[in-house]
Design a protein with these regions (language model features):
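Exposed, interaction-prone extracellular/peripheral surfaces
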Residues: 1-177
């Protein structure tokens, strides 16, 4: 109950908090691999998926953070966009994704998975990993970091993919290019 507003209006006013406002989404983009036509195509699609997802989440009022092992063309550092919110952040987000370069020998993406530690409700963090990498070791590492949280892995592919076994509570979405 908002007592100050109730007193001003003379009628009971209750603040409602939408569940989506408490949700935070971390989008992690893996840009390892360059030079092979299929890898380049899949990395480009991965950027498109990650950026579009972030924009839609921001427009829905959800707080977003985005990280990638892809190097920023200006700083030479891995792309990092700590928590942003609101439609006013869309331009900065699009610029960050546009400046992330795919390359060989990048830092392993596992180092960019959020831990969720230090948050009041660690279950309020949803992590979405966008990667063309279909190795089981990567999927296992992501599931291990997720713990009991339901996280999502999006795998862009071309022509065919090999269905991986389910690991933990991570859901996997195969995205045909």
């Amino acid at each position: 109950i908002n007592w100050k507003a109730t007193a001003k209006r003379g009628q009971l006013l209750v603040n409602l908090h939408e569940a989506t406002l408490a949700l935070k989404v971390a989008v992690v983009l893996d840009l390892e691999g360059l030079g092979v036509q299929q890898a380049d195509l899949l990395n480009e699609e991965a950027v498109r998926i990650a950026c579009t997802l972030c924009v839609r989440l921001l427009e829905a009022g959800i707080k977003v953070s985005a990280y990638s092992n892809g190097l920023d063309v200006h700083s030479g550092q891995p792309m990092a966009l700590p928590e942003v919110s609101g439609p006013g952040s869309v331009l900065a987000l699009r610029k960050a994704f546009a400046c992330a370069l795919a390359a060989n020998g990048l830092e392993p993406i596992e180092g960019f998975f959020p831990s969720g530690e230090g948050q009041r409700d660690e279950n309020s963090l949803l992590c979405v990993l966008v990667t063309r990498d279909q190795r089981e070791s990567r999927a296992r590492a992501f599931a291990q970091r997720a713990g009991q949280r339901e996280w999502l892995q999006i795998i862009p592919y071309r022509d065919e993919y090999e269905e991986m076994p389910q690991f933990g509570t991570v859901r996997r979405l195969y995205w045909e290019v």
